[in-house]
Regions:
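Short, structured patches in soluble enzyme cores that scaffold and shape functional sites
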Residues: 18, 98-100, 122-126
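Short, well-structured hydrophobic secondary-structure segments
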Residues: 21-69
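Short acidic, glycine/serine/threonine-rich loops at helix termini
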Residues: 51-54, 87, 109
Length: 136
């Protein structure tokens, strides 16, 4: 078992503005604030999302593209984690539930664009998650 232990850390509140990629926005904040690793939680709305689930048979994600037409994709739950890899790049892993006119869709958030915005919290744990989540 690999175990990461961090202290009670910094909590950063973010407002991801309309038209902005969630992953890029979070990655920029993690890099600029020199964060190490922690949790992501959020709610809000999306204009566009690519949501997938992993197929162990093909070892690929089966992806569904969702786009808001007359409304938004309401983010009822967004949770994940982030960490900085040894090469300095930021790894972000997010799962999401989205309320749509056709029901709720959920899975791995591969891409998401905010509309009108997202309220996101980064809970920095100061963890070296790269040594734990070596598969990423």
């Amino acid at each position: 078992m690999r175990l990461g232990v961090g202290g009670a850390g910094l909590i950063i509140a973010l407002r991801v503005p309309e038209g902005v990629s969630i992953h890029e926005f979070i990655s920029d904040v993690v890099s600029s604030k020199r964060l190490k690793g922690g949790l992501i939680i959020g709610i809000g709305g999306l204009d566009y999302a690519e949501v997938g689930y992993y197929s162990p048979m093909t070892k690929e994600y089966i992806v569904t593209q969702l786009r808001a037409s007359t409304t938004v994709l309401e983010v009822t739950s967004l949770i994940g984690n982030y960490f900085v890899k040894p090469d300095g790049s930021v790894s972000i892993h997010i799962h999401v539930n989205l309320a749509t006119p056709d029901g709720v869709k959920g899975g791995h958030l591969i891409k998401g664009v905010a509309k009108p915005f997202l309220e996101v919290f980064l809970l920095e744990g100061g963890l070296d998650l790269a040594s734990i989540f070596t598969h990423r």
